[in-house]
């Protein structure tokens, strides 16, 4: 749920920076700067990657038959959230200061924000190793997942044991 909520918040931030790019006089200044890179990544990373993580954590008990370690899952979320914001938020300021996109080397005045962005990118990347550890631990074992581990999940897939057996429905299920 944390990844789903963060998706909404961060996608909204990306959307608001897109509104700034829709204003012609401002876009003239921001065009081809790191502000566009920050906007793009604030829409893309939460929109795709955070959504994938939210769905992976939702379906992991059904796929593996075991619950994941929630403490590790929360740690993964916070490391990803902080790393993503450290990586991409400073790019707004770099773009507003005039740092162009697609350059092999940047002026020294941009070094501090680029260092913060680099640290954030490494943190975000390293936190994905933790996600792999969570998945492997879940596959290897742990607390058994019930057929319906989440409150409110009422679809047909939640009526069968976890993990779902082959030939799940020998007879067509009754849909109410």
Residue positions per predicted region:
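Intrinsically disordered, flexible peripheral segments
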Residues: 114, 121-122
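Active-site proximal loops enriched in glycine and acidic residues that flank catalytic Cys/His/Asp
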Residues: 24, 44-46, 83, 90, ...
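Core, highly hydrophobic multi-pass alpha-helical transmembrane subunits of bioenergetic inner membranes
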Residues: 15-16, 76, 92, 108-115, ...
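Membrane-interface interhelical loops and short amphipathic "cap" helices
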Residues: 19-40, 66, 93-115
């Amino acid at each position: 749920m944390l990844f789903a909520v963060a998706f909404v918040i961060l996608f909204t931030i990306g959307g608001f920076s897109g509104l700034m790019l829709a204003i012609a006089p401002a876009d003239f200044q921001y065009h081809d700067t790191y502000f566009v890179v920050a906007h793009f990544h604030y829409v893309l990373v939460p929109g795709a990657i955070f959504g994938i993580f939210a769905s992976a954590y939702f379906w992991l008990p059904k796929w593996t038959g075991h619950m994941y370690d929630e403490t590790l899952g929360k740690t993964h979320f916070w490391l990803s959230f902080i790393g993503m914001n450290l990586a991409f938020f400073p790019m707004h300021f770099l773009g507003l200061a005039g740092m162009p996109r697609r350059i092999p080397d940047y002026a020294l005045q941009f070094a501090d924000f680029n260092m913060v962005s680099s640290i954030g990118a490494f943190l975000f990347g390293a936190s994905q190793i933790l996600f792999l550890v969570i998945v492997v631990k879940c596959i290897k074992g742990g607390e058994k997942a019930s057929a319906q581990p989440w409150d409110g999940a009422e679809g047909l897939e939640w009526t069968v044991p976890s993990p779902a057996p082959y030939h799940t429905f020998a007879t067509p299920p009754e849909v109410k």
